[in-house]
Regions:
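Alpha-helical scaffold segments that form or flank carboxylate-/histidine-based iron centers
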Residues: 58-68, 93-112, 131-144, 170-182
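C-terminal segment of N-terminal export signals and the immediately downstream linker at the start
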Residues: 8-9, 46-79, 83-86
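N-terminal secretory signal peptides
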Residues: 1-27
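Conserved alpha-helical segments that form or flank metal/cofactor-binding pockets of metalloenzymes
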Residues: 101-126, 149
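Secondary-structure edge/capping motif, primarily at the C-terminal ends of alpha-helices
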Residues: 82-90, 128-129, 154-165
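Acidic/histidine-rich alpha-helical segments that form the ligand environment
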Residues: 145-163, 169-200
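Preference for long, well-ordered alpha-helical segments
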Residues: 188-237
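N-terminal export leaders
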Residues: 26-44
Length: 254
């Protein structure tokens, strides 16, 4: 089982209560496909049955990075949906679930995705390639650092499992600025940085880095970090009443 952090903290207790057998889940660089069921059959949505492993497709390094962004965006959505409640009824906010979300963002997003992949392999190569895209890297690094500061703030004010009245408005403001920053940050990476990085590599280099990223993930988490992160954010959404995708369907225009 994945270990996002050590030491028996709230996240570790959370994981222990929600352990799911992962023997039939593919590696991070494989999507399982079987007829019409497709990749969504991987025990991600309730009621879906895990697919056969008879037909597997490789997942490239860039797709890996963008899927990881998908996990982080789901954390951002949790934070964004919490802001109105912090304004109106902070006592009713589940601080423990928010703490788990911040811990997931720290462990999976900041310590793994940002430090081990982007800052070690992607940004240096983009800088080396030069051009206008390379100039964006400094801003992205600054945002990484600011994000870590905000995450530590969130972890601090949510560590007791409830939100103190005095912390409600500062936390709401932190969520608003954090979400806005990372929405723009990840969008630029997906549409500018990752394509530039891919174009700077040969096909063999890209394949080698994809394998290296998987090795880093296994060393960091002891298993499939992406699949476990998807489970964790799903459980956090469930705890906060945000698991039903249909509730976010926009109403018709009037």
């Amino acid at each position: 089982m994945l270990a996002f952090g050590e030491g028996g903290g709230p996240l570790e207790d959370f994981l222990g209560r929600n352990a799911i057998v992962t023997a039939m889940i593919p590696s991070r660089r494989q999507l399982m496909t079987s007829g019409s069921a497709g990749a969504l059959g991987v025990a991600v949505l309730p009621g879906l049955v895990a697919c056969s492993r008879s037909d597997e497709k490789d997942v490239g390094a860039v797709e890996d990075l963008m899927r990881e962004h998908g996990v982080l965006r789901r954390v951002l959505l949790v934070f964004a949906e919490t802001v109105p409640k912090l304004h109106s009824a902070p006592d009713a906010v589940d601080g423990a679930a928010l703490n788990k979300g911040a811990k997931l963002f720290h462990d999976f997003g900041e310590e793994y995705h940002e430090r081990k992949l982007e800052e070690t392999y992607i940004f240096p190569r983009v800088r080396k390639a030069g051009g206008e895209v390379a100039a964006v890297v400094d801003t992205l690094l600054e945002q990484h650092q600011r994000g870590r500061e905000i995450t530590q703030f969130v972890l601090g004010v949510t560590k007791k499992g409830r939100i103190a009245t005095a912390d409600a408005e500062p936390l709401a403001r932190a969520f608003e600025t954090f979400v806005l920053m990372y929405q723009n940050h990840t969008a630029r990476e997906d549409t500018i940085i990752f394509p530039a990085w891919k174009n700077a590599l040969t096909g063999s280099e890209l394949d080698e880095l994809g394998d290296k990223f998987e090795d880093i993930e296994k060393a960091q988490f002891g298993g499939d970090g992406f699949e476990e992160a998807v489970k964790q954010i799903g459980n956090i959404e469930q705890a906060l009443g945000l698991a039903d995708l249909a509730q976010f369907t926009a109403p018709p225009p009037r």
